[in-house]
């Protein structure tokens, strides 16, 4: 099973698909914009909820607005709290990758 996260300026959507490509779980929440900590917590909670819902480990793919520079920092995101953050590295650390 695979988890896809679509992170946008208004919402974060999590979708889990099975090996046949069928959606087995979907959830949305508003994108927190007050702080990077709040934003990051929302993302990790979405991943945890998805894992619990399907009761197994998941591979995770994430789409975020903006570009990533050579140092792994997000640039030009419409989610201002993401700019200058090493989101991928932070997420890898949180997931134990």
Predicted feature descriptions by range:
Residues 41-44, 48, 56-59, 68-97:
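Glycine-rich phosphate-binding loop and adjoining helix at the ATP-binding site
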Residues 6, 61-65:
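Short beta-strand segments
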Residues 18-19, 59-61:
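Short coil-to-beta-strand
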Residues 10, 65-68:
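Short glycine-rich anion-binding loops that position phosphate/pyrophosphate groups of nucleotides
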Residues 2-41, 45, 73-74:
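Short glycine-rich, Thr/Ser-proximal phosphate-binding strand/loop in the N-terminal lobe
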